[in-house]
Amino acid sequence: MTLNNYYDLAIIGGGASGLTAGITAGRSGMNTVILERLSRTGKKILATGNGRCNLSNNNITLADCETSLNSETVSKVLESFGNAEHFFRSLGLICRTDESGRIYPYSLNATAVLDALRLEISRLGVEETVDFKVTAIRKENGKFAVISEDGRKVIAENIIVTAGGCSGQSMGTDGQFFDVLRKLGHSVTPLKPALCPIKSNSPFLKSLKGLRVHANVSLLDSEKKIIASENGEVQFGEDVLSGICIFNLASKAEKGMIVSLNLMPEYSVQQVNRLIRHFQKLRSDTVAENLLTGILNKRIAQIILKECDIPLSKNVSEISVKQLNLLTEKLGNWTFEVSDKAAEWKNSQVTKGGISGTETDEFLQSTKIKGLSFAGEIIDINWKCGGYNLHWAWASAQYAVKSIKKHQKGD
């Protein structure tokens, strides 16, 4: 069954990118349909930012992403879109910005974002076809035929794929569409969970579960070389390290690497050592368990003392210089070996990998199939935590549609 005789544009995937593409196409007068595999568009938007929808970040730069796309292309996308608040104000949604540059809907409710997007889709007359799981794309009489699992067919002059990656599988992004694109001759770079916890087999994590600590966090390779660093709050789970700073390192983490926490980054090694020696004199008549009181959470302090082989019941005055030096080192380099990333896709916020940037041109169009474009997470690009990935979703979708329209005009 054919839903309509012909569309200027078929958008595959009704998430953040798909809805933005639909709005941009509708505003430019294109006859457009959004094809969504779930029973409703935009479901994943509701889960972003813990339900508050961190929709952008004022500090976004090219340095905040990992990608195989040409850097000039990414820069053009960001420059073309500009400030996300302007786009959302055009939808009737006002925003607020926190001290870190993270942009949220003023209501701090993700539903407001989705409602604004869908209201504009409706106003523009853009069709939304749900429960349409695309299983094949082929050419018929020079046009694209998009085929659903149940045999329905949509004919379109152009296609934008906004089907997402593999993260958030309960919300429609299970990576299935990469198989469709592979059959069309496209390459997919290795797919890995990103913005997710990092697993460790440290025997102490179970005792640390539920605690948080502020630290400078570094990811080290097998030669102890720093791969990347972040600063922020680390959350301890039963077998994982979590928190935004950990999420931002996860895409680079591999089994056998080391996560190093500097628990006192504002102090030099010498300053930490002098401070501990001062505390030893100050608390010489008490036990080691109390040595780090005033510096660290008690449970964290106990674990670190144990790792330094300092019995908690040992008199502080009896702690040796060697043990104090080891403790100093541990406070600046508390290590956890990576056993694996928390590899279930359900625990990741975005996907590392996707359609290779070498197979998309400067307009986010396929270099293999004329009329096929990509936007959002389907492309091999992932951004750090804090609204950056959603910014890319909006920006790349708008850019891809504008590029199609530009080429239609022959510019």
Put a short name on every predicted segment.
Residues 50-97:
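Glycine-rich active-site loop/strand segments that organize a redox cofactor
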